[in-house]
Amino acid sequence: MARRLLPAGLVILVTAGCGGTGAGAPAVTPAPRSKPAETTGRPPDDAGAIEALLRQRALALERRDVAALTGTAAGPQRGRDRRSVRWTAQLSRLRVRVVSDELDITGDHAQIALTLSYRVRGMSRPFLTARSLTARRTSAGWRVSRDAARREPLPWEVAPFKATRAPHLVLLSPPGVDAARLRSGLSGAYRELESALPQRELPRSVLVIAARDASQAGQLAGRIARGVVALANASVQFGPKPALAVERVLAERMIVIDARWSELPAPERQSTLVHELTHTALNTATSGRTPPWLAEAVALHLSGDDRAAEARLRAAGAGASVGLRELCRPNSIFKLDGREQGAAYAASSGAAEVIVARRGTKGLLRLYEAFNNPAIDGPTCVATTDRALRRTLDMSLAELEAAVAGR
């Protein structure tokens, strides 16, 4: 049973996290690849029975049918299923789909790896997540004894989120979060981007999950770097090398850590939302070889977060400093410690402001698109970046780095 939700090609989950202090956490994690289902020791009808069981679970959750959902489970999983039904009560028109990636049956036990997608009213595309299930044969047939996330849990496994909507936005918020204020801020940020990127088609709707605090955000998305206020995820399918252009965005979402966001001054709150929405808006244009410094440069500039003066001070010895050529490889900012991440964000902002001063915002966006051009290629990421700069802006990487440092 080949997975059907994820088409062939290079599929990855990209995460970018940004904070009011400049500590970010871009990460690239391979998404599970499609594999044929494997069965051992049982006839094919066991596989069919398990597939039917998985479909029953998805339908029961959609309908919030406690009896039907718990009837597919055994042991402690029944209690977790009851809670899931309770905690989806305020997610209107929930739609759930599952597709098996791997099925390994040994005797009366089965291990299942699957992709689950969910959608609530207002979402233009579902969000995908990887699950791992254990099932066992009982006198009543196959039952799920464990259903757990392989990466991030589902929102309703963390808290009873409520869905609210605004034009182009679906916000899931838990108890204790001022959804109205965040929704208003997000709507304003979307309008700002519409004005800043008039030639770009923005996402028809963006899924935003409000985490109450850093602990809840960690439950939803894994490790959260200190200082991160919001982050954006996208699951994308890349095309062939050398361009690695995005062929399809499979899923995308934002997470806002409300406890941190709420403490920021109003201008910084809005800047944070514009920054993360910029990452989301540019998902289709973000090649697999787009330098992390450039991705952050565009988001920092469009959100009005100018750190060019800080970059010059750092280059003069006032603090940690990092060159753009050190920030060309995927994950290069994520791998830095907190102090160095601040330097990386300052350098990225400095680069944006130099480019905009000389070539305008259109020049900055033209450079961004250049990494989708297969004709621009080099033996290393630094060489490719230098060639993209020369081709689009008539500027070398060395010249840009010198200008960022104020030399």
Predicted regions: what is each one?
Residues V14-G17:
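C-terminal motif of bacterial Sec signal peptides marking the signal peptidase cleavage site
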Residues S84-T129, W261-S262, V274:
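Surface-exposed, charged secondary-structure patches
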Residues T21, S124-F161:
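Short beta-strand edge/turn micro-motifs at domain boundaries
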Residues R165-P291, A320, T384:
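Juxtacatalytic substrate-recognition/specificity segment
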Residues A37, G41-A52, Q56-G107, A217, ...:
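Short solvent-exposed beta->alpha transition segments
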Residues Q237-E252, P267-T272, T284-R407:
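Acidic/His/Gly-enriched intrinsically disordered linker/tail segments
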Residues R33-T40, E51-L54, K162-A179:
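Acidic/histidine-rich, surface-exposed loop or edge segments in extracytoplasmic proteins
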Residues G19-P44:
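Short, low-complexity, disordered segments immediately C-terminal to signal peptides
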